[in-house]
Amino acid sequence: YRCFCSSERLSALRSEQMANKETPRYDGHCLSLDPEESEERSSNGTTYVVSLNVPTEGECIFHDELRDEIRIAWSQVDHQVLRKSDGFPTYHLANVVDDHLMNITHVIRGEEWINSGPKHVLLYEAFGWVPPKFIHLPLLRNPDKSKLSKRKNPTSIFHYRDAGFLSEAVVNYLGMMAYTLPDKREVFSIADMSETFDTSRISLGGPIFDVSKLKWLNGRYLREQLSANDLLARLGKWKFNDEFLGKILPLALPRLETFSDFGPLASFLFAEKVEIDTDSISGKLEPADAARLIKTAEWELEKLREWEGEPIGNVFNRIAEIEDLKLKQFMPTFFVAITGSGVSLPLFEAMAILGPDLS
């Protein structure tokens, strides 16, 4: 149905509901509009969105391949906007249409999407389409059982690639998350898993993503699955190759007197993490200020579309301008955070080589 409510009305409604300690949701005001009036206002060019007509009573019942029957009261489902005022569809509408047109048979997603199930079921019914099978997987957890987030462990797959993990080991480890092979073995290929995969063997308990266990498994692959020649080839493909070393050498050369100087200067570019030498920081900031600036830099760097030395440097120059600081006042903190030392290769160019995930 068309909804003509202004942003002011919606904001006032939200404020009133929050003041009454109610869950903010649309009240279905425009659902009661006479169809002729709705058509007339649309024809006159009045701005509107298209919202999902959700039943007011009863509950949505749908089947999950892992959880069997899921029941959610319609009163808990909001009137989702399906098409924005500019004519573009929102995620929920686009998702259902795309899945249907691509003949998707199984929708496999995280359990945080369970509450969106009724919206999608309602859309499939509205279109007269047979919905796919739904599988809502348990979310990965940190060792302390908290929800997996990059604040505690890196979550980008590119981080583990750049840090030197084998793709086979990462796939193997992810395959172990909430799933076990019938013979209980821990080292297996994706082909092995494909041959025996059965959704009924997936555990609903929150699987723990433990980096130390991943490292242990990766070590087994290095020692048991690869020959010496394979290892040399993989090391070369990873970072010990002319292309990667060729990027570092121009930065290191002005600081080299012997070949043995190269290792200490460039070692951070081959490490997943660095040992922090806080004593080497000159012009120290207060810890709270340093933490705030590091977080600010992280947010700003995440916006970069071009990960090169100059754009990276521009980010730090903007931070210096906003904070009314000189670069020399806070850059030592970032030198140590990235390289582990207050003396190293030119930082912006080194970060460009290191990549966004490890940086």
Where are these regions (language model features)?
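N-proximal short alpha-helices
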Residues: 90-93, 143, 187, 320, ...
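Catalytic adenosine-cofactor/nucleotide-binding cores of aminoacyl-tRNA synthetases and other
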Residues: 115, 127-133, 137-276, 339-359
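Active-site cores that bind ATP or allylic diphosphates and position pyrophosphate for catalysis
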Residues: 6-136, 141-150, 156, 181, ...
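Short, charged/polar micro-motifs that form catalytic or ligand-binding hotspots
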Residues: 110, 160, 204, 320, ...
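Basic, alpha-helical terminal appendages of large translation-related enzymes
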Residues: 1-51, 237, 242-247, 263-359
